[in-house]
């Protein structure tokens, strides 16, 4: 707040640190709740370092200044002011501020102008670059999450129940731009899933190493030890026999196997499977039924699950992105994803792009228009050794997301990387984070 606004307060606000912007060198306070700054930039940078929730309460010049610089410093700010230009209240669409380029949540109240409007009118404006869904998730967890321990030995800041809504219209592929993301690796991994292949060496030979650490012989041995410690040797003896036969690179009956061969007994990654339920082909058939008959009971049953309880102990990792559901509405296709566990620094950026791409692919096959991806993260967490990197990422301004082109295909089994083209991806530099295993 400005110095005049601060002086107008009848008392200090509860549970708040008051940052006062004043060029008056004589301004000072002995109260720990009051800190003076020469410039707004200094105040916002300090608040951002402290992961603070920021509210700006005026005066008018401070509101203007905040709108001008907020996007370079902080991702979300709430601004309150009781006296605003009449044009804001009489015509909310004709305001003095540029609301289209600044990330903010701005509440304008005319309570001091009630004689003109018959009461207090409030208008809320929210900047909606879709990448702020992700950046605001980071801030939400850092502010409201709880420090917790977990199996990896690296503590996390955890929040239960978080949601992302990602638009997919106009051939947009959501790839984060506030850090460089290797979208080619995401394409390769998704096709690996869709092919039903559970050998991570297939990815490694293409330069994609993201599954290597979870499929080594050492990891398999540790997996057996953890199962025995958790459940006892008698409880998991049959699963142990299977895991002991895994060669290095074998991921077990994870996503791929469940998507394409649900129910088929898993032997190893070298076995060719011809039985089980092909959930991917089945859901495409169901989507086509619903497209032609909106009243079909299949409309709310377009579900693919990777959570096969009978196979969980045989997997190197239990599925994090557990279940997804498609929705056909007025010629469009949306996808909702239930994710039991989400590593916000490393995993979620991949999941956003991967399931958006999957939705585009299925929509292309079914002759529908992609609309939206909604992700529900049951346990959203930030590893403590990612906090510095993610805090820095929040200060970056998102760029335009790339365009996706997919060749018209009829059969999911005929899909190759040559059918997928990503255009005009631009981003900030790469941010290095270590994966906890």
Residue ranges and their predicted role:
Residues 128-437:
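Terminal, non-catalytic protein-protein interaction segments that mediate quaternary/complex assembly
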Residues 1-129:
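Enzymes that bind and transform nitrogen-containing heteroaromatic metabolites
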């Amino acid at each position: 707040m400005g110095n005049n606004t601060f002086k107008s307060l009848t008392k200090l606000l509860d549970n708040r640190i008051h940052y006062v912007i004043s060029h008056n060198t004589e301004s000072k306070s002995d109260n720990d709740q009051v800190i003076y700054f020469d410039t707004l930039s200094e105040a916002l940078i300090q608040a951002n370092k402290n992961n603070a929730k920021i509210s700006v309460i005026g005066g008018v010049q401070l509101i203007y200044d905040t709108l001008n610089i907020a996007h370079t410093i902080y991702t979300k700010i709430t601004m309150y002011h009781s006296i605003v230009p009449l044009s804001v209240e009489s015509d909310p669409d004709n305001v003095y501020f540029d609301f289209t380029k600044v990330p903010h949540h701005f509440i304008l109240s005319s309570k001091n102008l009630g004689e003109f409007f018959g009461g207090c009118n409030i208008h809320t404006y929210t900047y909606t670059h879709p990448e702020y869904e992700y950046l605001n998730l980071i801030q939400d967890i850092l502010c409201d999450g709880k420090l917790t321990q977990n199996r990896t030995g690296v503590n996390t800041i955890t929040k239960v129940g978080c949601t992302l809504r990602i638009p997919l219209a106009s051939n947009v592929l959501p790839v984060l731009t506030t850090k460089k993301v290797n979208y080619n690796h995401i394409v390769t991994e998704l096709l690996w899933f869709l092919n039903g292949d559970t050998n991570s060496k297939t990815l490694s030979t293409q330069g994609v190493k993201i599954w290597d650490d979870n499929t080594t012989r050492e990891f398999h041995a540790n997996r057996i030890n953890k199962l025995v410690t958790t459940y006892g040797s008698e409880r998991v003896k049959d699963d142990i026999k299977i895991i002991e036969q895994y060669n290095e690179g074998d991921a077990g009956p994870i996503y791929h196997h469940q998507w394409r061969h649900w129910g088929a007994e898993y032997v190893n990654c070298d076995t060719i499977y011809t039985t089980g339920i092909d959930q991917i082909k089945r859901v495409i058939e169901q989507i086509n039924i619903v497209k032609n008959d909106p009243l079909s009971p299949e409309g709310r049953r377009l579900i693919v699950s990777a959570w096969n309880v009978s196979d969980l102990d045989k997997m190197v990792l239990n599925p994090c992105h557990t279940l997804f559901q498609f929705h056909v509405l007025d010629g469009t296709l949306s996808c909702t994803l239930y994710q039991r566990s989400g590593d916000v620094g490393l995993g979620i950026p991949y999941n956003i792009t991967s399931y958006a791409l999957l939705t585009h692919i299925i929509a292309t096959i079914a002759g529908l228009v992609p609309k939206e991806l909604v992700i529900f993260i049951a346990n959203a967490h930030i590893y403590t050794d990612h906090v510095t990197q993610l805090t820095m990422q929040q200060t970056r301004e998102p760029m335009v997301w790339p365009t996706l082109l997919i060749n018209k295909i009829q059969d999911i089994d005929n899909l190759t990387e040559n059918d997928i083209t990503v255009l005009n991806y631009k981003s900030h530099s790469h941010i290095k984070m270590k994966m906890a295993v």
